[in-house]
């Protein structure tokens, strides 16, 4: 009988991938902008042609979410991709600041972990951004979606090979093991790590040399004020929460309602497909849905509200889209106060907006994953207080947190990897092309207030040289 040591194979493969990625980088920097853009068009066309097949394949592997929603979101992204990226520089572009200039540079070897939800979208976006910035990329897929992600990577590798890109520019760890992954994420060769995983699957990454973007779904909250358009709020929140069966970055987890608006909210929620669970029902559901550590059972992630209710033995209406658990207080021990990977929300009732404000903070601090908060209100002062005082990465106004946070119907970037924290050198918590680049400030001695140190002739000469360098960068790359 042949015995295979997967750990050793995984470590060996990880080392080879790192070596090849580092070697490819030296060749990549000679590739001009026109050649890069032609390649990006081909990769975009590949995804556009194959998105239906890939999304269905991913669903067959994972049973998570709704492949129709991933296709819809993917096509929306592709239709808006060129306009979306126009405002972001490419490498060697000169970025003009108020008092100085910066040049965009490739960040280096990058590593991305892919979660088993929206896996084709997150893979495409990471690969596209990495190629755009000429960053060699190593992909590590969750085992549940490994076949789909591997197919995508191998298909795009063929396109790279046909266009004479170096070996190692893009690859995937096919011998998965904890030790192999550790070899990758602890390597000094890695400059950027995108950790896009479900919270309970997060790695304990330690790497002082790499910037780490920790993406997650988040424990996101919606506050519904008594003076807002309750019909609009109810419709948008329910449709956002049910999108992809609740597997969307920034998706709604808890609703905080002002007492005077409660009855109207319940009426409208029911109208749009909400089913309110009794205390006995939500206790029964909790026992079925969560394990003893309060983690959602993997086989029940991304199921529809009706499927979950049926498994739990709870009779719901035929038009049920979302399950609502009414809670009197926030509990560290209750899974309903945290991230939920299904169309389930918790509902909290407060006397007024001030108490609602405190409840939102309590929910945010409960598991420290308060990524997005939405406020539905027409009161400018109340909106201002929520924006100013909530410890979250982003606040949305009169927009659902789920679809709004990923850039649908808002001015936020269209992005499928969201974080609670910024990384050095980038002021956005939605993954953008800038996360795959570093920016180096360029200064030149051309100010007249130092003429006592330098002659005017020298200053002009230096300035001419500086302009020549900038023009050369823009022309050649």
Residue ranges and their predicted role:
Residues 89-232:
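Rossmann-like NAD(P) dinucleotide-binding subdomain of oxidoreductase/dehydrogenase enzymes
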Residues 101-106, 162-166, 184-188, 204-207, ...:
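Solvent-exposed alpha-helices and their adjacent loops that cap or buttress functional pockets
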Residues 185-188, 229-230, 290-298, 336-338, ...:
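Short, surface-exposed amphipathic charged segments that create phosphate/polyanion-binding patches used
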Residues 7-9, 203-331:
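ALDH superfamily catalytic-core signature
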Residues 2-3, 16, 23-25, 29, ...:
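Conserved C-terminal structural/oligomerization subdomain of aldehyde/semialdehyde dehydrogenase
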Residues 22-25, 29-32, 44-51, 55-58, ...:
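Structural signal for hydrophobic packing residues in well-ordered secondary-structure cores
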């Amino acid at each position: 009988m042949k015995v295979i040591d997967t750990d050793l194979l995984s470590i060996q493969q990880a080392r080879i991938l790192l070596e090849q990625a580092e070697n490819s980088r030296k060749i990549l920097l000679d590739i001009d902008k026109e050649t890069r853009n032609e390649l990006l068009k081909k990769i975009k066309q590949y995804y556009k042609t194959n998105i239906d097949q890939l999304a269905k394949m991913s669903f067959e592997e994972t049973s998570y979410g709704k492949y129709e929603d991933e296709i819809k979101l993917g096509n929306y992204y592709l239709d808006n991709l060129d306009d979306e990226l126009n405002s972001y520089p490419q490498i060697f572009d000169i970025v003009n600041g108020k008092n100085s200039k910066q040049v965009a540079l490739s960040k280096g070897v990058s590593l991305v972990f892919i979660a088993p939800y929206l896996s084709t979208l997150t893979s495409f976006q990471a690969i596209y951004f990495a190629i755009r910035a000429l960053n060699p990329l190593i992909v590590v897929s969750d085992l549940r979606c490994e076949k789909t992600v591997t197919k995508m990577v191998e298909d795009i590798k063929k396109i790279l090979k046909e266009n004479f890109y170096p070996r190692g520019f893009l690859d995937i760890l096919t011998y998965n093991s904890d030790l192999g992954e550790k070899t990758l994420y602890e390597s000094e060769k890695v400059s950027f790590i995108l950790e896009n995983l479900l919270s309970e699957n997060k790695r304990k990454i330690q790497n002082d040399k790499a910037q780490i973007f920790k993406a997650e779904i988040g424990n996101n909250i919606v506050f519904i004020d008594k003076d807002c358009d309750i019909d609009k709020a109810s419709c948008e929140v329910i449709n956002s929460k049910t999108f992809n069966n609740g597997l969307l970055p920034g998706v709604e987890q808890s609703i905080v309602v002002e007492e005077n608006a409660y009855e109207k909210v319940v009426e409208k929620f029911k109208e749009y497909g909400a089913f309110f669970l009794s205390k006995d029902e939500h206790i029964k559901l909790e026992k079925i849905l969560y394990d003893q550590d309060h983690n959602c059972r993997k086989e029940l992630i991304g199921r529809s509200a009706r499927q979950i209710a049926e498994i739990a033995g709870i009779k719901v209406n035929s038009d049920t889209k979302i399950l609502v658990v009414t809670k009197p207080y926030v509990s560290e021990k209750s899974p309903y106060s945290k991230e939920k990977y299904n169309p389930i929300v918790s509902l909290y009732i407060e006397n007024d907006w001030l108490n609602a404000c405190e409840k939102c903070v309590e929910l945010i601090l409960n598991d420290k994953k308060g990524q997005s908060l939405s406020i539905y209100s027409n009161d400018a002062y109340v909106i201002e207080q929520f924006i100013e005082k909530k410890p979250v990465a982003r606040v949305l106004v009169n927009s659902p947190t789920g679809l709004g946070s990923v850039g649908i119907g808002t001015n936020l970037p269209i992005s499928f990897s969201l974080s609670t924290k910024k990384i050095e050198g980038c002021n956005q918590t939605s993954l953008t092309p800038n996360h795959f680049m570093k920016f180096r400030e360029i200064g030149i001695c051309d100010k007249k207030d130092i003429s006592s140190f330098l002659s005017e002739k020298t200053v002009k000469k230096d300035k001419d040289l500086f302009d020549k360098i900038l023009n050369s960068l823009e022309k050649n790359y």
